[in-house]
Amino acid sequence: MPKMKTKSSAKKRFRVRPGGTVKRGQAFKRHILTKKTTKNKRHLRGIVNVHEGDMGSIAKMLPSAGL
């Protein structure tokens, strides 16, 4: 049976932390920022964890991550 391939888009977007959680960047922070408030842009900073309900699809996209 051939090797399971990792989705190239997923390996660029997600990183697995040592505890088994997956971190991701925030969306809505790339363009059209003039109409967004400063408070809204400030809350979009930083890294957040992937929601528990999405971990199944992330595990399928990253088979070698051991999730």
Swiss-Prot record:
InterPro entries: Ribosomal_bL35, Ribosomal_bL35-like, Ribosomal_bL35_CS, Ribosomal_bL35_sf. Gene3D superfamilies: 4.10.410.60. It comes from the Bacteria. The keyword Methyltransferase does not apply. The keyword Lyase does not apply. Disulfide bonds: none annotated. GO terms for biological process: translation. GO terms for molecular function: structural constituent of ribosome. GO terms for cellular component: cytosolic large ribosomal subunit. Keywords: Ribonucleoprotein, Ribosomal protein. NCBIfam families: rpmI_bact (TIGR00001). Belongs to the bacterial ribosomal protein bL35 family. This is Large ribosomal subunit protein bL35.
